[in-house]
Amino acid sequence: MPGPDDDVREPTAAARTNNSGYGLRAAPSSITSGLDSVVSVNSYRSSELNAEEVNVDDQECADSDILESPNDGMTIMNDDDADLSEEEEEVMENSIDFSVNRATVTKAGVIPCCVFVGRVRWGTTDWEIYFGQKQLLRLHFNLHLYSLFNRHKLLRGVHLPCTIWREKRAEKRVMDVYVVQDYIRQLLKDRDLRNSEPLLSFLEVSPSRAMLRLGPSLKEGYVHMRINGPFQLPLYTCFNRTIEALYRHLYRAWMRIAFVSAIVGFIFPICLVIVTSLPTFFSPQKELVNSDSGTKEVSTKLNTAGVFLGLAVLGGILFFAVFVYKFFQHRLGVIRRWVVLKPSCFAAYRNRNDREPSEVFLFDKNFTARKGSYRQGVSWMPSGLVVGSKAGDIEIDTGHYYTRLTAFVALMGVCYGIMRLSNSIYDFEYLSLDKSMGVPITNASGYENWTESRDAEYCGYYFIVPKGTTVYVESKDDSAVISQLQMPSSNSMTANLGFFWQSDSMGYSLNVITNAVGAGTMVSVVKPIDAKNDRFFESGTNYSMPTVGNLTLEGVKTDIDVQSFSNVESFCAITVRIAPLTWRSYVYYILFLFAGGIIAPVVGFLANYFVTYLGIWHPHVRRDHWFRCVRRLQKLKRQETSTRFNSFAPQHISTIDDDESATITAKAKAAKLAIGNTPTSNINQVVDSVVKQEAETASRMGTGNLAPASSRVDSSTQSEDSFEAPKPPPSSVSWHVDAEDTYAAMYKAISNAKYEILIAGWWVCPDLFLLRPGRKLPPREADEDPDGQQVNKTMLRQVLMKKAEAGVKIYVLIYREVKLALTLNSAYTKRSLMVHPNIRVLRDPIFQIQSLGFWSHHEKIVCIDQSLAFVGGLDLCFGRYDHHGHPISDPSDDPVWTGKDYSNPIIKDFVRVNKPFEDLIDRASQPRMPWHDVHCSISGPPVQDVAYHLIQRWNFVCSKNDYQLRTGWCICFRSRRFKFLPKCLVPMDFNGWTLQYPSSDPEPMRDGSTRTTIPLVREDSLSMVEPFQVVQSVNPMYPCTATGPQWPPTSSLHPINPMRPPLTSASTTTGPLDDGEVLRAQRGESILQVFHPSANICNIQVCRSVSMWSAGVPTEASIQAAYMDVIANSKHFLYIENQFFVSGMDGNGIVRNRILQALVDRIERAVQRDEKFRVYVVMPLLPAFEGNIRSHELTNLHAVMHWQFATICRGRYSLFEALKGVTNHPENYVAFFGLRKYGIMPNGCAATEQIYIHSKLMIADDRCAILGSANINDRSMNGDRDSEIALVIEDMQYEDGVMNEKPYRRGVAASKLRLQLFREHLGLADDDLSVADPTSDHTWQAIKSTASSNTKIFEAVFDCAPSNRMRAFVNFQSIEVTQIFENQRMNVLKVPGRSHVWDAQNLKDGDYAPWTDVNGVPIAADRVDLRDFEVDNYRDKKKKLFSMDHDGWCYARNFSIFQEVRTMKTDYKKREKLQHLVADRLMAQVRRRRWVKKGLLPPRDPRESSFSLASDDEEHGRFYSLWRRLQQGDFSRSNSVSTPTNFSQLDTDGGISGSVSVGGTNHGRRLYNSNSMPSNASILGDNPTTRPPVLGDAPSYPNSPSVASFQHTPQSPAIATGARSVRSARTSSLLCTGAGVRTRGNTRSARGSFYGMFSVTGNRNLDTDDESSDAGSEYGGGHGIRASLKRWYSTMDVLDFGRRSKFNAEYFDTDEDHLHSDDPLLEDGRGSYHAATREGLLTEEAVEGSDDEDAECQIGHVQTAATVRKEDETRARAQLSEIRGHLVEFPLDFLVEEILKPSVLPADIHI
């Protein structure tokens, strides 16, 4: 029931008593009134309504659903979102009104039945229900049960009239309409019954009735249903489609047969055994014992062991029975649900008062509906219907209980038949004695004293079954009792109660199940003594039987209890039958059970059909009503526009009219006037007169027959033949290039959401900021600190949480990644977002077999209220935010890219996304990878198609997780397969469907009320009566867009009621309506007001790539079809932006998509016709996969490159190879480009990086565009791999343009996007029109020339990869090396002092070479001049894990530890640190250190160097550590055992001695062989002048942004005094550098540091300035150091120990007067770059850096990101200023001489 805030208003006082206010009704249909068997009866209705109250209700309804003004951030709750509680509110008296509208006689069976059509009114909603006499009987029975179990008393207040109990003819039953009406009304007056589940279910009252935004409920009720979708049947995929169809067709029928067979074959025999064995376990045992008096007495005792054994056996049998039942219950998949028929779906609720459905079956365009019959075959249910679509079938069974009843009766009959027929399987032999040879009782021994008394005495005999024989004994004597006796202990015996039966009892029929006994068993046969007819024989008589053997008959007698037996010398003759049991008997019995298992369900089916055919009960009444409603919806679906590209979504055609023409057209249609020949004034006059006449009619007739306007019931109708669908509302699109504009639009749309938000993504980061500071983030709030960092409240999780708290329901559907391959951490996303009940998150797939789970869900969808959708290639995740400037660095003090949002996937992919504020790479030295993407927002009918796709996927995931729908073989007893099962989604109703019902002519009564005649209608044909009709408004009202014509027209069609649709003609007000409901569309009241700025009206077709595994539907590849169609129909040019370009041609059996073939065919056609046709392809220079492109170890990076090059230019199936046979100049038709950007890093170095193109876009002829999430590869295009969605957007608005130097009408939307992209890539102004003609030779050559010029400049300045000059791996050797790693191993057999303990010559096979890059790739000796390098001895967080000395050496067990630590996490716990301490520090075998090109290391504070007091982590105290080092005169731990390698490894030219030359090529991770090392190394002497300056050359700056984390340390006086001179010197140095890079030379640091105080050998460096000398003198000896430390600590500021905020810790401070800018000053119109002059680089104050290590490039020094040396920046400045835009050539010859395809990876993963 609705909550207190629901939009279900309590009717007025007049409306509470009114039963006839259902609107102005037309006369009965001519079809109905023309029937011969019409009987009229009267139904009394109450008084009239007031017209003023109707108008008030009308206004309230109009105001309830239409949002007239912005909500200022507040959320308007929908009627079904107000109360989420599961408890149903009490139904107040008079809130539900009921009346019988009409009675119908239907002859669906042999016996006609009467169907009552009741009218239920609840609040502002009314509907009709269909029921018969059997439903009323069932209602009354359920009410009795409800009162008994809930109220604990019998139902006495309301009695079912006897006339309803009695069976009568249908024509006479119609006279009971008043009785039925009064009976239901009496039930509604009782408070308890009014709120009872049986009555509310009968009246179909549920909260879904009030859910206006989901559309009207055409039919509701409890039914049994099955969903036969994918994953609902085990092994649903077969090798043959015919076999698969047959399997699906008969699966549940065979399961039902198997179920009944299991009952008959297993459960039935076991139950019989239980019934006959219970007395054995639980009955007391009786024995004869000797009493004290010497007589025999019966002793009774309980067998305790038998009781427990019986309980155990009973429990096991019950468990087995329940197991079989539950097993087949899940196999059949039958569930009981409250099912609601909506215009778009079947919504199934677990309970009637639920607000969210547990299962939803969506209708597609071509869904089918058929009644259940023997031909249908799915379930063989005569009282049900089957609705089918591409996603499967749903079976609605309205008579499931009747089916169960007939099945149960048939089962019992078959079981009884098996028991009765089982005697036929035995070969009986009779044991019959000749009575003529016997003697009467008077002469029988042992009976001499027998006298006749009241107590019956039994005589008889017993025998022992011979060995090796099992027999079955029975007697035809009704009085005979056969028992199994226990072995006698004396002269008495006791019967075994487990084998005790009488011939005339049910035990007689149990036969082989209970009466078979084995060898050695004593079987007694006794009967009451008949003194007259019995004859006695002597005990011990032998009787021979051929099949059994000799039987010795011993006489026994017993009393009436037949419990204790005593021996007697004679016995009476009793004839019995004895049959031996053989294997033949058991086989026959099993065959009986098997035949019975098949006969039972078949008989049940036939009995159900027969009873239904006769019409004895009426489940078909409900079935027929359900079926007619579904069939009517089926007709409506088929009236829609056909689809394109084999898509699931219908084609939407937008129409464009201006305001005046739209108004005139609508009015002309309303008055049935010719538009061209009728003046506008005449149209207005006609329409106004119609409205006036309607108002007068309503006032003259009163409002007694008018329903409140809030019920949306209108009398205007259109017949089926004259129906003309109104023009659909227009579709509009708005472009969003790059994430800044996209996220801003999403933020605004999410903030304005009213009802629900749907999000689907490949990756969703809850910590993503949608708006960024300095860009589109709103100004600071008044309560914020103006000097502090601005608080960003646009984090995705915060925005969604705010809307969830406001009542908006949020559904997030994300891809569940394969953890071994991806690090998306979707589990973290789910945990972070699911913090409110209104936020639901699903991850899919849970388990996937296809290709080992490599396929993914790749859509990027955000849908707001199902009325505004964002579709494109942009994920809501890290690394995507960017704008048109595409900066590669973020030097601002208020960063735009925080934490992991500053990323470069090629350098380092995302890890630990649950820690969003950790840096992935070094911000000071490593550039971020700019991200280019294109998204769009759409409004109009296509939004419902996008929402349909997402809802279908959501519901499919729910159905896969729903244990009650699955029929897998492993689910039996688990009541809930998932603890929190999400609810399904129902599409919103944007057609504004409302129900309208006909009524009879009213007749005024004396008391002022009205009387309505209820017709009796005989339905001989179901097609005669339709359940509802469609009446749509002539002019659908839809919200206007920011551009283009206003929609709807500004002038109202009805001055009296603007929201009311126009009338088609005056006659339609009184025209007849068909019997049943009328479904009317009133778009103006149902469609939300959507604010869609900068939108253009166009046609939009939604396409997708889905299959069984992803969406539960047959494979759909409509995106590929759309691409091929647009390419084939293009006339002038194609512009393609895509992340990948992998396609194939005919004959290529590996790559299956044929986009490339369509492209070749189109170019071939252009060549043949001598047409100018251009193809622009813009794609990434390198795929964004982490890897080493110069390594021979091929990875995913090389694999994707291989397939892209194979598509473009390499191989016989490539594009250029195919074009060679078509034209000699393919370069005139197609060109490939990339994007690249340069900038200045915070460390002062110029750098470049590719702009990663992630968009999935194609523009054709400036008139059509395809945009979505689908890449050009098989994963996205084939449909059976990744799930995708895309939009085909065709312009409907055109403007003048130029194409091929000729006038051309170009589309407004497509050309707008294309020009925006061209201007951004080429660096043009926003109003530049030089690229307006993309086909002309001038534009073609200019674009190619710009790209070529930019490429040459980038290669000349940065020497970056990829490049056409790098044709093989050997070409990488010519690229400058910027960092190298020196590797050594310890030789434990050598003694220090005699030889080096650490040496490169100790390296073993499998170790790194002496000199390698970061990945272990050897570096040739002739490529490195060590004098140009310096040791990186700064200890970051990762290096602290190793035992690092002050020469930069890091120690570990083996070289693999270095790679693991470098590529894995950095937030190590204490346990992990202890592990490294024990394993790596104490057992170190190898060591490694890094050498970096001079000028590339970021400036650092001297206190951060390895010589700092604070950096000596290996010692217990700073003072003692420094004192020990000063006493030793050495600052290097390694100098005590070896000569510094940085000197010994140099030859006379400064090169590396002992390094390995690769001989012209490099091998990835080459295993180093110590035998190949030179034996003698050229060592320079101890002359310090010839030694390369390793330390002390670089000045130190305390606030470098690349510095890793360190705490504030107290400043020494020397540092404080030298601060000003440092800043002055640095400023002057920067200003005089042309390229903006600091001048290094021989300038010494003005600060007191160990850089300027000591040389490498520990001696005092004399080449220092005065301040350095003074500072160093304090540390010159043992006496001076103590005073220096004392003064140092005395001057420290205690506040410096405080840790700064997390945001400030990751970035450096800037000048207050500094103006933020996107790009460094190397671009045109800018002076020297600002990053070097920031106060953050020059301030004396130390700041805390990031905790992450300085990221090391995964691909070594050859990468898309490259830097410029300081010596080259002056020259580079002039060259870089000549770059225009971002466009560069795509390197088609990159690594053309190498094989890039990995042999171990499957091909389909990368294509």
Curated annotation (Swiss-Prot):
Ranges of Polar residues composition bias in the record: 1531-1547, 1568-1578, 1597-1614
Transmembrane segments annotated in the record for this chain: 257-277, 305-325, 587-607
EC number(s) stated in the UniProt entry for this protein: 3.1.4.4
InterPro entries attached to this UniProt entry: PLipase_D/transphosphatidylase (IPR001736), PLipase_D_fam (IPR015679)
Active-site feature positions: H858, K860, D865, H1254, K1256, D1261
Top-level division of the source organism's lineage: Eukaryota
CDD domains, A to Z: PLDc_vPLD1_2_yPLD_like_1, PLDc_vPLD1_2_yPLD_like_2
Localisation per UniProt entry: Membrane
Identification of the protein by name: Phospholipase D
The protein's role, per its UniProt record: Hydrolyzes glycerol-phospholipids at the terminal phosphodiesteric bond.
Topology in the lipid bilayer: Multi-pass membrane protein
UniProt-listed SUPFAM superfamilies: Phospholipase D/nuclease
Region listing for Disordered, in residue ranges: 1-28, 697-734, 1531-1621
Molecular function via GO: phospholipase D activity
PLD phosphodiesterase domain residues: 853-880, 1249-1276
Lineage, top ranks: Eukaryota, Sar, Stramenopiles, Oomycota, Peronosporales
Alphabetic keyword roster: Hydrolase, Lipid degradation, Lipid metabolism, Membrane, Repeat, Transmembrane, Transmembrane helix
Entry keyword Transmembrane: yes
Name of the encoding gene: PLD
GO cellular component, one term: membrane
SMART domains in the record: PLDc
Organism: Phytophthora infestans
Record-stated family: Belongs to the phospholipase D family. TM-PLD subfamily.
Coiled coil: none
Catalytic activity: a 1,2-diacyl-sn-glycero-3-phosphocholine + H2O = a 1,2-diacyl-sn-glycero-3-phosphate + choline + H(+)
Biological process, per Gene Ontology: glycerophospholipid catabolic process
